A protein has these predicted regions:
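Cytosolic catalytic domains that perform sulfur/thiol-centered chemistry
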Residues: 1-159
């Protein structure tokens, strides 16, 4: 994936990369304006879907907390996070500087594109969008897992 020109990463290619020696970090950015189920109201929107099924080893990204700033109402619903806040989120996800990442969602790429754009804006080079997102991955009967993925958090500050 080094030197990505095309931001889209195919499911078949990703499945091969996941079996390799240096798999990319998978970032699940599924998000909706409102929770789908009443029991999801206590968690970030999209987290319930993540717990039910996600790509193997994926990390859940909360659009409202990780990909947005928290300013005044006049700043809009999802203003940009500060570089410091974004770096803290990236480190919490376990993404090390120089590591490859693939971002996906289930809403046509809107949330994933925001994560991709912010990662690129703040200096990530090898980041891609999963072509077709979670829906295509599942439709092709590719492996998923449930629950919380275990991953190594980044030890060094990111950017």
């Amino acid at each position: 994936m080094s030197g990505v020109e095309n931001p889209l990463f195919g499911a078949e290619q990703l499945q091969r990369e996941l079996a390799g020696a240096k798999p990319p970090l998978l970032l699940d950015v599924r998000w909706q304006l409102v929770a789908k189920r009443p029991e999801d109201a206590a968690h970030p929107v999209g987290y319930g879907d993540f717990l039910e099924a996600h790509l193997p080893g994926a990390v859940f990204i909360d659009l409202a907390q990780d990909l947005a700033g928290h300013g005044e109402p006049v700043d809009g619903r999802h203003p940009l996070p500060t570089p410091e806040d974004f770096a803290a989120s990236v480190a919490r996800w376990g993404l090390a500087e120089g590591q490859e990442a693939v971002v996906y969602d289930d809403q046509g790429g809107m949330s994933a594109a925001r994560a991709w754009w912010l990662l690129k804006l703040f200096g990530a080079h090898d980041v891609a969008l999963l072509d077709g997102g979670m829906a295509k991955w599942v439709a092709e009967n590719r492996p998923t897992e449930s629950g919380i993925s275990s991953f190594a958090k980044s030890r060094a500050p990111w950017r």
